């Protein structure tokens, strides 16, 4: 592997790493040489995924429910017992909620905002000591937040809280990038369009819906796991050392 993309000796944590985009990124980081911890609320699924991903490198599971500040604190404590530092934090855990406008529940809105925005803030806050231990001017620590093209473009689909939550995450990331750059901690956002995941499987499993959805994307298709992994590796590697405060769409041109 070219040294520009090697993550040998680096320690990474991927939240929501048991499936979907989180699993894609975790596998990519492992293949690039990083030691990777994944966390998810479902302890069994998290452990099963870590076992599968161990075929690519050193992967360990940390069960964690990030729906509260206490959960983020427990995650940081658990990671601190396993590693003295954290080089790469990927905040991927998230959720959505869909319902008609007239019946959209406030409880659903609050759940989406809590997990997609507040929990990311709490995770960064609680993991700052470990990130600071790895940060240097030559090789900054990296925070990679997983936003969405829905935070850039008005996608609708009755997911009224999802787009606003991702737009809020994008802005939070810019603010943190500005604040933490002096401590050699870089904060960037990956804003995916369509990728295979639990959140999009209802479309993927319907051939007509998949065809119509793909037609709305300028490149005419969904993203592939290796494309998501490659972008994360770039941000975690040499290219990401001189980047902070960016929101990077990976959506086949959907945001244009």
Swiss-Prot record:
Gene Ontology, cellular component aspect: cytosol
Keywords: NADP, Oxidoreductase
Catalysed reaction, written as an equation: a (3R)-hydroxyacyl-[ACP] + NADP(+) = a 3-oxoacyl-[ACP] + NADPH + H(+)
Disulphides: none
UniProt-listed Enzyme Commission number(s): 1.1.1.100
Annotated substrate binding sites: 148
Pathway entry: Lipid metabolism; rhamnolipid biosynthesis
Positions annotated to bind NADP(+): 14-38
GO MF annotations in UniProt: 3-oxoacyl-[acyl-carrier-protein] reductase (NADPH) activity; cholate 7-alpha-dehydrogenase (NAD+) activity
Active site, renumbered: 162 (proton acceptor)
Matches recorded under InterPro entries: NAD(P)-bd_dom_sf (IPR036291), SDR_fam (IPR002347), Sec_Metab_Biosynth_SDR (IPR052178)
One Pfam family this sequence matches: adh_short_C2
CDD domains in alphabetical order: RhlG_SDR_c
PANTHER family reported in the protein's UniProt record: 7-ALPHA-HYDROXYSTEROID DEHYDROGENASE, 7ALPHA-HYDROXYSTEROID DEHYDROGENASE
Known function: Required for the synthesis of the beta-hydroxy acid moiety of rhamnolipids.
Family note: Belongs to the short-chain dehydrogenases/reductases (SDR) family.
Protein name per its UniProtKB record: Rhamnolipids biosynthesis 3-oxoacyl-[acyl-carrier-protein] reductase
Gene it is expressed from: rhlG
